[in-house]
Design a protein with these regions (language model features):
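Terminal RNA-binding accessory module
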Residues: 337-434
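Conserved, mostly hydrophobic/aromatic
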Residues: 172, 189, 225, 253, ...
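Short, electropositive alpha-helical surface patch
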Residues: 202-215, 235-249, 302-320, 344-349, ...
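Radical SAM/AdoMet-radical enzyme domain recognition
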Residues: 181, 208-209, 216-223, 234-295
Length: 434
């Protein structure tokens, strides 16, 4: 029998979804630690906080299943309390209260002070940048804005995250300096829309100015850009990328589709011609830039012709990095008023075809790297290999560089120089040269 009065509470934060959720969990954990709480990330704890995702169906299912798993553990006496926060809770709180009432309390995306109070902690305004990072020690996510003002028809993010709100440059720099002091060498800048940064605060797109301030932070060696938007992209960012070696020649810019009829229905504010020109301008401005994009197939009304236009365009553009997802019909979005008329098996078949095509493109591009020298950062040791990345690869989603651990010891979290000896579609094999 438990003697709860003698037991010290341990808070386990479970994170689901995207890098923005990772960041939010780290902020929560930093606040809890500052209040003297024993807090862990995805380990054993008698109090559980689940930071959920509510973006698409698969993510919602994972979040619901995780909630049910911990509610069952609560009923079995394995945990004492279960709290739920994040996007699913923001979007569906009334439904969740009705369907899963055994959760102790639900909190939305803007209710951090309330969540902390429920956990017996105080919200401290002065804790700018005091996060408890959960990523490997060499990199960290740095959120520069919250929310989104774009009207994309398929996307529920504005419902869960609200309007775009930029973080002041001064606050971002303070956070970056604190991360660097902890040994972080790579900053991955994230937002729903990086290209909008500054419009609300400074009345102009200010991403380039932010980058120029960040490169001055001592200890930071790489700065990576995630989640740009093709409309209104501030081209002065490319000037900074060319000029400053700390800015990775890498851009994650989700393009979603390329058929003009689908782009119009998606309310993306661009066309195939404009998008293609933008990408070609990127290539001219930064010749060795790696472009990552994501695509959606099976959007309402997507015909075989629309799909073939997309497929041929992927062949033409030869993206270095690409992900493809099937359309998810989301309540309260503009596209929800359209008929979800592409069968699920057709959606999946199209997504598989795009990824098979990308696998071949990636293999061909990787063959060109054999014999070349790259600076890599070592993220971890896994089995018989040290696993690293070049500046052209983001954690978890891109290529990895594998170094035979039996031949050379390299320190995790550090940079080293390697020569590529072999290449697969999404992996590079290398030997250390210095």
């Amino acid at each position: 029998m438990r003697t709860k009065s003698l037991k010290k509470n341990r808070i386990n934060v479970v994170t689901l979804g995207c890098s923005k959720n990772v960041y939010d969990s780290e902020v929560l954990m930093g606040q809890l630690k500052a209040s003297g709480k024993d807090v862990v990330h995805e380990q054993e704890g008698n109090i559980v906080v689940i930071n959920t995702c509510g973006f698409i169906n698969n993510a919602k299912e994972e979040s619901i299943n995780t909630i049910l798993e911990y509610v069952q553990k609560k009923e079995d006496g394995e945990v004492d309390k279960v709290f739920v926060t994040g996007c699913l809770s923001e979007r569906y709180k009334p439904d969740l209260l009705k369907e899963i009432p055994n959760v102790d309390e639900y909190f939305g995306t803007t209710e951090l002070p309330g969540l902390l109070k429920a956990l017996g902690a105080d919200y401290k305004h002065e804790l700018i940048g005091e996060r408890l990072t959960t990523t490997p020690k060499n990199y960290a996510y740095l959120k520069i804005a919250e929310g989104c003002d774009r009207p994309c028809s398929f996307c529920a993010i504005p419902l869960m995250r609200g309007k775009h709100k930029s973080t002041p440059i001064e606050a971002i720099i303070i956070e970056a300096e604190k991360l660097a002091a902890k040994g972080v060498k790579e900053l991955i800048l994230i937002a729903q829309d990086l290209t909008y940064y500054g419009l609300d605060l400074y009345k102009k797109r200010n991403l380039a100015e932010l980058l120029e301030a960040l490169v001055k932070v001592e200890g930071i060696e790489w700065i990576r850009l995630h989640y740009a938007f093709p409309t209104g992209f501030p081209m002065d960012v490319l000037d900074v990328m060319n000029r400053e070696p700390k800015i990775c020649n890498y851009l994650d810019i989700p393009l979603q589709h390329i058929s003009d009829s689908i782009l119009k229905s998606m309310r993306r504010g661009t066309t195939k011609e404009k998008t293609t020109k933008l990408l070609k301008d990127f290539r001219v401005a930064v010749p060795n830039m790696t472009i990552r994009t994501t695509l959606i197939v099976g959007y309402p009304g997507e015909t075989e012709e629309d799909y073939q236009i997309l497929k041929e365009w992927v062949k033409e553009m030869r993206f270095e990095r690409l992900g493809c997802f099937t359309y998810s019909h989301e309540e309260n979005t503009h596209a929800y008023n359209l008929e979800d008329d592409v069968p699920e098996d057709v959606k999946q078949e199209r997504a598989n075809e795009i990824m098979e095509l990308q696998s071949q493109i990636s293999w061909e591009l990787n063959q060109e790297k054999i014999g070349k020298i790259f600076k890599v950062v070592i993220d971890r040791k896994e089995g018989n290999y040290f696993v690293g990345r070049t500046e052209f690869d983001s954690p978890d989603v891109d290529n990895e560089v594998l170094i035979d651990a039996s031949k050379k010891y390299v320190k995790t979290g550090e940079f080293t120089t390697v020569k590529i000896t072999e290449a697969a579609d999404f992996d590079l094999y290398a030997e250390v040269v210095s």
